[in-house]
Amino acid sequence: DENLFQDYCIGALEFIFYPNFIKPKKEDRIHNGRKRIDITYLNAANDGFFYNMRTSPNIIANKIVVECKNYNHDPENPEIDQVSGRFSPTIGKFGIMMARNFENRKLFIDRCRDTLKDSRGLVIPIVDEDIINLLKMIEKQERESIDGYMYNIYSEILKD
């Protein structure tokens, strides 16, 4: 169910990325209600990966845009375009695509790279396996490793 998956995403991301992600808003309406974002958070990061995304002149991630895809197939170009279509000068150009898994992760990373190269913003994929890995870091008292994990995904997207 789409609603349950959104609730899972809100809770997981807020717990994992606290205190960087604050004030989650489900079904955030923009453009006078003509468009909807599954989840937004204010980016309150004062250091690390999300701070760098907030202060990067090409990203300016004031908000974290999250689209949730509870599919049994890989999200494709239209789903990435949906995320980047929610970016704006006030929101910024950073988003997370939450999905269950990727049959072809490399292809999805390539699509994220295309979006970034076309100056349409940065979309970071996070799947169930990533959530489990991030929660294990917290369980082992290694919360400081989360930034490195995010930088690793970002580095995959930057590779040519």
Report the location of each language-model feature.
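Catalytic core segments in nucleotide and nucleic-acid processing enzymes
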Residues: 1-160
